[in-house]
Amino acid sequence: MQNGRVTLAARVFSTSYLTGSFVLRSGRTADHYFDKYRFESDPALLGDIVDALVPLVPPGVDGLAGLELGGVPLATMLSARTGLPAYFVRKEPKKYGTERLCEGGDVDGRSLLVVEDVVTTAGQIVLSTQDLRSEGARVAHALCVIDREGGGVDVAAAEGVALRALFTMSELEASRDAGSAPDPF
């Protein structure tokens, strides 16, 4: 597993790591960026990422809540792998049609795993968790591919959400720099 994990980390890094000047969702500026659309649009890489996420799905959840936009392909493929239904959470309700915040069915009474792509401060996880809870869902867990280590784990915990990442920024950088990504699991 360690070698497979190292290889996957290196693939994610080489596919999606960019350098330059980037403004993050949190408003922070960074000199590097993980372009999640690069790994989410590669079917083989996305499949391997999701296969690595499957064992991280906590027991007791009965639905996956993919956050707009990057969490949607992850939740869709994770749904196909686990058999759990997927729900798609908008940043704000549509202003036409069903005018729903959450698509895919009623989440009232469901125990949902929030699925996100890249997390820095967990701001969107917190907002979406609050929205899902207002719709009657129970949310105690979130899962992401990359934790940029910007305090998101602590912010999510303060909201009562345990956030797990497939990789931290440090692990991805280690896969590039030292050819290894430590296995935290």
Name these PLM-found stretches:
Residues 51-62, 129-135:
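Phosphate/pyrophosphate-binding loops at sites that engage ATP/ADP/AMP, CoA/4′-phosphopantetheine
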Residues 35, 114-116, 121-122, 141:
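Thr-Gly-centered strand-to-loop micro-motif
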Residues 2-11, 131-185:
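PRPP-dependent phosphoribosyltransferase catalytic core
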